[in-house]
Structure formats: C-alpha cells, structure tokens
C-alpha cells in the first residue's frame, strides 16, 4: 500500500525568438510492504532496502529548466537540464538503512523542418551519485541488483556505507513524415553508461563496476480516421553490459592506508535483446460542452538475456503483456472551471524461464573469489527456473482547474488505484495521491 504527495510549480515565458521554461517539483511516498518481484525490479543502489519489505519513506526534490531559440524559420535549437535529489529511508523501528541520490542531467538538440518532414538530433549527459548506509548487525539481508541478479550485501562483510557513481552519455537521431491523415516517426538511439559501486571498510571485496552499451530503434505509425486515432509502435533494443568484481587488500591495519587491487574478476557479461509491439486506439467526441475520449492500449514485450553471472552461464527468456481500457471525460463548469475524470481497468501479466550451467571457480595466482547468488525465482529443478506473475487493477484520476487570472489557474489532482497481484501468492493492495497544483 502506498500514499503519495506531490506538488510542483512551473512556468514559461516567451521573449521574442527565445522561449524559456522551468519549475520546481517535490514528491513524497509512504510505502507499506512493497517488495521486489518479476514485474518490479530495483533501479539503483538506494532502492536496495526495498528487498526487506519494511515501511519506507521516499522523498524527491527536482529543479528543471528549458530554453529554445528559433535560428531561422526552418531551424530551432534547444537545451534543457535538471537536478534531482532522492531520499529513501526505512520507517520501521529498526531504521536499518537510509539512502540518498543526486542526479544532474543536461541535454541539447536541433530540429530542421520542411513542409512535410522534420529532422532532429540530440545529445544528453547524466551524472548520478548515491550513498547508502546499512546496519550490518541486522539479521535481515539487504540486497543490491547488478546485471539482473540479487546479491546479498552481507557478502561485503563489515560494510556500513556504500557509494556508487554513474555516468551516461547518449545521442539520438529522429525523422518524422507528416501527411494529411497519417504520420511516420523513426528514432535511432545510442548510449554508453559507466557505473561503479564501492563499499567502504569491506575486507577484500571492494565493489564492482559496470559498463553498458545500448543501441535501440523506435518507430511510430499514426493514422487518423474521422474521430478515431490508431497508433502502432514497434521497438527493438540491444544491450551489451560487462561487470567486474574488484578485489583489494589493505597491507596495514591503518584505516587510512591505500587499498591495492590484487585481482579483477569478470562478475558478469550480458547481451540482451528486447522487442516490443504496442497498439493504441482512441476515439474522441468533442460535441457540446463535454470532451470525451475512449482509450485502449495493448502491448507485448519479449526479453532475451544471454549472460554469464559468476559462476553460472544463464539464458533467460521473459515475456510481458499489458493492456488498459480507459475513459476520459472533461466537463466545462460555470465561470470557465474545468473538471476531468479518467477511470481505467488494466492488466499486466508476465512469465520468466531460466536455464543455468555452473562453471568452475575463477582463480589466479594471488587469490580466488566465491560469490553467493540468491535468485528471486521459484526453483523447479536443478537446471530450470520458472516464475509467473499477474497484476490486475482498477484506477481513477480526477482533476479540477479554476482560473484565477488570464495567465494563472489553480486546482487539485486526485488519483487512486486497487490492485490484485499473484506472484505466485495472491496479494491485494492499493494507494492514493492528492496534489495541489498551480498552472502558469
């Protein structure tokens, strides 16, 4: 179960050929009993505490800005960036962990427009630092998630402070063709990423580093027919990631002595191919004083993993189906007030299979490494692992907007959801969100 609060202030201003925008965003989530499963996996070091399923508080602050400039009737350039600080802490009486992350992102791009075509190019850079403190006296195991496997952080014996640093650089090329009743969009993307996790005072297991290369293609074909809009979106993504375990020793008993690396082991190597196809249909009705829209979305994603995770060679196949039916209604009230309502029903269902072969322990002249792996899937037999999960839910969103001035309006948003999840045990949960919003 979760309770979320969110507020933000944003605005924009046009100065001749220059357009500026920016804002401040704050959110807080109070979560109860959330744990990882096949459909929800941790993203960063500070989410490692989610493996405990303890009550937690997640707080996020974000400052962002954007700028665009018209160089000529056909050429536009732009730049945007943001800073985000995220806190994740255990709200139980034990206070086992607390994590903090700082993220800085900056990107820029250029767009060239013709009568029926657009061409674009962009580049982005992201820098992220994290810190997680953990009570090592706790009997509960805390996990982290390198390359798709959960490793117990107790293997880094004696550690109480973990740090990570990540850098990401990507480039993208886009083309778009616009016709009277249809449009076609292509996006080709490449990204490289480096991530290092380094615990302090951890004996001879000092951490690991990961390097990722990703190339992806995304297409979108849109066709309109009277009040109907149909969108087909194929996507393909290929990732290659390597992760190394770095072994170090402290030659003296002094805590300030320099650690020396005496071995580096290939902890993991992964090649991942993801293919996805989704379809969306909407029907709009703007007659009278009401605006109504029916929305239907279905999609299928298949993921193939071929990776070596010490000391196993693993082949993993995962499939995920999602669907949603929603109805959107906007009602114009007296004095230019507006009320919007969006009820929906959705389903997410996934399965996973895994085949594993064990290899010999890696050794070198100076030492050997033994790393225990704990997996989230139900073991069927010695070489085969399978898991299925299904999430069925209903939700609703409501927004009220009241004009205060020609350039200012205020209102609120209200969201709620109820979910039934089987993975393989059946659980029932829900959450709500209330926000006060100012529009400029």
PLM regions: where:
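Membrane-embedded beta-strands of outer-membrane beta-barrel proteins
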Residues: 9, 63-65, 104-108, 171-173, ...
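Outer-membrane beta-barrel channels and translocator barrels
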Residues: 14-16, 72-74, 111-115, 178-180, ...
């Amino acid at each position: 179960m979760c309770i979320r609060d969110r507020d933000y202030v944003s605005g924009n201003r046009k100065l001749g050929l220059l357009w500026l925008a920016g804002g401040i965003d704050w959110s807080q989530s109070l979560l109860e009993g959330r744990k990882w499963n096949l459909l929800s996996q941790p993203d960063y070091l500070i989410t490692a505490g989610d493996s405990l399923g303890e009550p937690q508080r997640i707080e996020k602050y974000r400052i962002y800005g954007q700028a665009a400039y018209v160089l000529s009737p056909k050429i536009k350039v732009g730049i945007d960036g943001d800073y985000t600080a995220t806190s994740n802490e255990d709200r139980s009486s034990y206070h086992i962990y607390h994590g903090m992350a700082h993220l800085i992102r900056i990107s820029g791009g250029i767009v060239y427009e013709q009568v029926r075509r657009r061409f674009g190019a962009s580049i982005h850079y992201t820098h992220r630092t994290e810190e997680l403190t953990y009570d090592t006296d706790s009997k509960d195991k805390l996990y982290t998630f390198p390359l798709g496997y959960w490793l117990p952080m107790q293997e880094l014996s004696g550690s109480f402070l973990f740090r990570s640093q990540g850098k990401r650089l990507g480039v993208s090329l886009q083309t778009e063709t616009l016709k009277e009743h249809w449009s076609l969009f292509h996006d080709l993307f490449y990204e490289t990423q480096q991530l290092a996790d380094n615990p302090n005072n951890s004996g001879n297991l000092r951490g690991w580093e990961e390097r990722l290369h990703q190339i992806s293609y995304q297409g979108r074909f849109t066709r309109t027919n009277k009040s109907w809009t149909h969108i087909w979106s194929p996507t393909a993504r290929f990732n290659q990631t390597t992760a190394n375990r770095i072994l170090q020793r402290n030659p003296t008993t002094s805590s300030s002595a320099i650690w020396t690396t005496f071995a580096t082991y290939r902890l993991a190597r992964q090649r991942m191919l993801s293919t996805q196809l989704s379809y969306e249909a909407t029907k709009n009705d703007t007659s009278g004083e009401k605006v109504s829209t029916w929305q239907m979305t279905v999609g299928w994603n298949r993921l193939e993993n071929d990776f070596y995770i010490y000391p196993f060679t693993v082949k993993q196949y995962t499939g995920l189906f999602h669907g949603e039916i929603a109805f959107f209604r906007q009602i114009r009230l007296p004095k230019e007030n507006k009320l919007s309502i969006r009820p929906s029903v959705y389903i997410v269902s996934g399965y996973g299979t895994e085949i594993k072969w064990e290899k010999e322990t890696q050794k070198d002249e100076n030492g050997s490494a033994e790393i225990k792996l704990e997996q989230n899937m139900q073991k069927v037999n010695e070489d085969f692992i399978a898991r299925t999960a299904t999430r069925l839910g209903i939700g609703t969103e409501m927004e009220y907007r009241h004009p205060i001035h020609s350039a200012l309006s205020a209102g609120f948003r209200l969201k709620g959801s109820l979910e039934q999840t089987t993975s393989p045990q059946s659980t029932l949960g829900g959450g709500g969100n209330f926000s006060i919003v100012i529009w400029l």
